[in-house]
Regions:
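Amphipathic, hydrophobic secondary-structure cores in small proteins
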Residues: 41-52, 63
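Short, flexible active-site loop motifs that bind/organize anionic cofactors or intermediates
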Residues: 11, 53, 67
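Short S/T/G/P-rich N-terminal loop/turn motif that feeds into the first structured element of a domain
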Residues: 1-33, 40, 50, 85-90
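Generic, well-ordered alpha-helical segments
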Residues: 20, 47, 55-58
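Generic marker of residues within folded, mature protein domains
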Residues: 34, 43-45, 67
């Protein structure tokens, strides 16, 4: 299945407390569980005013459905074309 990077504009995201991040994570996992095996949350990166999430899903519509059900912004959804890393240079 395709992998997607979701850009979520959340002012002050980098200052969210451990408890707030826990609650956000629980909400996301609950929606994933409700939607079934067609979507999987891999991980997220939290920065100053953004959260970048990586999901596996059949299509962008499924990713956006997850965001809507969870009450999360999904300002930009990009399908990953490929991944590179240091070993790509070898």
């Amino acid at each position: 299945m395709p992998k997607f990077v979701i850009e979520r504009e959340i002012p002050g995201a980098g200052k969210l407390s451990k408890d707030q991040l826990h609650a956000i994570s629980q909400t996301s996992c609950g929606v994933v569980s409700e939607m079934g095996p067609k979507i999987q949350w891999i991980h997220s990166y939290v920065t100053g005013d953004m959260i970048y999430c990586v999901y596996i899903a059949p299509d962008e519509a499924t990713v956006r459905e997850h965001a809507m059900k969870g009450g999360f912004p999904a300002n930009k959804v990009s399908q990953v074309a490929t991944m590179i890393e240091p070993t790509t240079a070898e």
